Regions:
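Acidic glycine-/aspartate-rich tracts in secreted/extracellular proteins
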Residues: 79-82, 94-96, 129-134, 162-165, ...
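Conserved catalytic-core segment of clan PA serine endopeptidases
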Residues: 31-43, 88-134, 144-146, 163-165, ...
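C-terminal subregion of chymotrypsin/trypsin-like serine protease catalytic domains
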Residues: 17, 65-81, 178, 218-284, ...
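Extracellular/periplasmic catalytic domains that process cell-envelope and extracellular macromolecules
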Residues: 40-44, 68, 82, 116-120, ...
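Protease-domain processing segments flanking chymotrypsin-fold serine proteases, especially trypsin-like
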Residues: 2-75, 84, 90-92, 189, ...
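Active-site region of chymotrypsin-like
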Residues: 44-62, 133-138, 183-218, 229-231, ...
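Chymotrypsin/trypsin-fold serine protease catalytic domain
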Residues: 123-129, 134-207
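Disulfide-rich extracellular modules and peptides
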Residues: 82, 158-160, 190, 207, ...
Length: 295
């Protein structure tokens, strides 16, 4: 069973209904992956992976998407790894459309302030045991709130694995779609009441569109200007909170804005014993030198 979007009350800071992926409840209404998306080029996006995990407390097998930001590290959403054991997670990467390889997980690094019920700090890192072979390049991270000043939006790409609107996608092929991404309380949450705590780390959001992430896409990358800007976290419908079906024209998707977590990402990796030199220009995180200890 895949992780699916559910409707719930975010009691700490949202009074309207939103939908996030939750391992405990299956929403059988959501049958699509990236709604109205298309297969992505594996050679162009070699850093894309998906992983399956067994949640024994709920007796469910869940699936999420992730991005290789370094040879040993997969960036994803915390609700994808919450209550999962590292021994029960398997990470897969397609070499081509007919062949994929797998890696086991050595450690899970979930954000220490992650709130599963409120959806705050929904970010996690997986350290795999060994690097995948023949990865041409990894995804670098970037993004800054100033890029969205004066109501500006960016054309971005969302990628994910899972079911499609035409099949159950048993092979878990990856799909992508183009989105117009906004930032700011007025742009993203004009119909939703938020507290100050949430507004300090405002997510990115898409304009209402039939193109949106669905089950299996959670944790997947939002790529803007060729860089990783966000992580797929939730969907919501400000016009009709009861209509959370993928492909609904008023549906919007929300993404954790990596800008607010750049220090957490770099510090978490540094504390694992890996040496990483970061170049921070306009808060853009790019890897210049990586030296790994494979012990």
């Amino acid at each position: 069973m895949q992780k699916v979007f559910i409707v719930l009350q975010l009691i700490e800071y949202i009074v309207a209904k939103m939908a996030i992926l939750d391992p405990n409840i299956l929403n059988d209404k959501n049958k699509e992956l990236i709604s109205y998306g298309e297969l992505f080029d594996i050679q162009k996006y070699p850093f894309m992976v998906y992983f399956e995990s067994m949640i024994y407390t709920e007796n469910t097998l869940s699936m999420c998407t992730g991005s290789l930001i370094l040879p040993l590290f997969v960036l994803t959403a915390a609700h994808c790894t919450h209550e999962a054991d590292k021994y029960d997670i398997v990470v897969y990467r397609y070499i081509n459309t007919h062949r994929k390889t797998m890696r086991y997980v050595k450690n899970i690094y979930e954000h220490e302030s992650y709130d599963h019920y409120a959806g705050k700090n929904d970010i996690s890192l997986l350290r795999i045991e060994y690097p995948f072979k023949d990865v041409i390049h990894y995804i670098n991270m970037s993004g800054h709130p100033n890029e969205f000043s004066n109501g500006k939006s960016l054309n971005c790409i969302a990628i994910g694995y899972g079911q499609t609107d035409k099949s159950m996608n048993s092979e878990h092929f990856g799909y992508m779609t183009n989105l117009s991404i906004m930032y700011g309380l007025k742009k993203c949450f004009s119909h939703i009441s938020l507290t100050t705590e949430f507004s300090s780390k405002i997510p990115l959001c898409s304009k209402p569109n039939i193109h949106n992430p669905c089950p299996g896409d959670s944790g997947g990358p939002l790529i803007c200007n060729g860089y990783l800007y966000g992580i797929a976290n939730f969907i919501y419908n400000a016009h009709n909170p009861e209509d959370m079906k993928c492909g609904s024209p008023h549906l919007q998707s929300g993404y954790l804005f990596i800008y607010f977590y750049r220090d957490w990402i770099s510090n978490t990796i540094l504390n694992t014993g890996n040496l990483i030199k970061l170049c921070d220009k306009l808060f853009k995180i790019s890897v210049i030198l990586i030296i790994y200890n494979f012990s």
